[in-house]
Curated annotation (Swiss-Prot):
GO terms for biological process: cobalamin biosynthetic process. GO terms for molecular function: ATP binding; corrinoid adenosyltransferase activity. This is Uncharacterized protein all2391. Transmembrane segments: none annotated. InterPro entries: CblAdoTrfase_CobA, P-loop_NTPase. Disulfide bonds: none annotated. It comes from Nostoc sp. (strain PCC 7120 / SAG 25.82 / UTEX 2576).
Length: 378
């Protein structure tokens, strides 16, 4: 029997894997640091009540000096306020873009300082996840020795997860990576013509779509920390009526720490939906989810709305496209919409996206038979 369509699988795990993986998110598209923050949130979600801070995370940010504000600053502030005992942050570098011809002694010194912190953290055994944010361009610029970094990562403690982000990942790093997702930007001239802003789409077969969306949710929460009532987030999920999905721990962590800010709804059967095995309940559940989303978009109550797995829902023809287009065209200007999920045929609302990243899967450890790990994969 031929099966056409897209199914959303729950995470399957036979036992807790003992070997931590090396993740690389690169490419020129948006979503790399956001995806890393999503993984951080998953790990923290499982570590809230864990003994001995066993899910502690280090977020080490290269090329991001303290003199400038970055997109993810609000997200990190939300993490540190909600889970101060589970996350450490170190920032290095100067707060401006520079090319190879503009490298200074300070740049090399700051890269070395950051790498010294990284080596100590990796060897310490204190962390379950170490994020090396923007280490890829640091290596590409020659500020650190690729061979030294690769050698250290290859000899890391067995259970430690490493996440490396940024453009220009060197081939030697990609060779040892267990997961490699590349963010490729796609541009939609119609969105520019219509002056559309605040619609982001993450699609493709690579890992990092829903996690990027969760990073955006964290950013929204962080922006509203000092302005109670100014920020509210809705996470609306389709095709996810069961449990054990990759982002469950992350959403649970958000709702536990920010219950008055985060709303979460999901719809669908606890089953994989194929095009040739759709049931009446699939249509009913998809429409139920859209009614919730449509009202939320029009209300102006939410500043960030995540429409998780809307793309495959439309691709499976469980929802019509035109009502979605019209709702997005009429959204409040200060409402951000993040839409996720792979699809075979791009629906018309893609033309309204001001940011669209195709997450391309070069390598994924799950395809090599590696068991999934709670707090990283789900």
């Amino acid at each position: 029997m031929t099966r056409n369509g897209i199914g959303i699988r729950t995470a399957q795990v036979r036992s807790e894997r003992l070997t931590g993986q090396i993740h690389v998110y690169d490419g020129v598209g948006k979503g790399k640091s956001q995806a890393a923050l999503g993984v951080v949130l998953r790990s923290i979600g499982l570590g809230i009540n864990a003994p001995n801070n066993s899910n502690r995370v280090l977020l080490l940010r290269f090329l991001k000096g303290p003199e400038r504000d970055y997109d993810e600053d609000g997200a990190i502030a939300a993490l540190q306020r909600g889970f101060p005992h589970l996350i450490d942050q170190v920032r290095t570098g100067r707060a401006e873009f520079f090319g190879p011809e503009e490298i200074t002694t300070f740049d090399r010194s700051e890269a070395g300082r950051g790498w010294d912190v990284a080596k100590g953290a990796i060897a310490s055994g204190l962390y379950s996840v170490v994020v090396l944010d923007e280490i890829n361009p640091v290596l590409d610029l020659g500020l650190l020795s690729v061979d030294e970094v690769v050698g250290t990562l290859k000899s890391k403690p067995q259970e430690l997860e490493i996440i490396a982000t940024g453009r220009g990942a060197p081939q030697k790093l990609l060779d040892i990576a267990d997961l490699h997702s590349e963010m490729k930007p796609l541009h939609h001239p119609k969105a520019t013509e219509l002056l559309m802003t605040g619609i982001e789409i993450y699609t493709g077969a690579g890992k990092g779509k829903s996690t990027s969306a969760l990073g955006k949710a964290l950013q929204a929460i962080g922006r509203g920390i000092n302005h109670p009532g100014s920020t509210r987030v809705l996470i609306m999920q389709w095709l996810k009526g069961g449990s054990g999905y990759t982002e469950d721990a992350a959403i649970s962590a958000l709702r536990q720490s920010y219950p008055e800010v985060v709303d979460h709804q999901r719809c669908g059967r606890d089953a994989i939906v194929w095009r040739n095995s759709r049931q009446e309940l699939d249509y009913v559940e998809a429409e139920r989810g859209w009614e919730i989303a449509k009202v939320a978009i029009a209300s102006g109550l939410y500043k960030t709305i995540i429409l998780d797995e809307l793309n495959p829902t439309v691709d499976l023809e469980l929802l019509p496209v035109e009502p979605i287009v019209q709702a997005l065209l009429r959204k409040p200007r200060d409402t951000e919409i993040i839409i996720t999920g792979r699809c075979q045929n791009q629906p018309a609302y893609f033309d309204l996206a001001s940011i669209h990243s195709e997450v391309y899967c070069h390598k994924h450890y799950a395809n090599q038979g590696v068991e999934l790990k709670r707090g990283v994969d789900f």
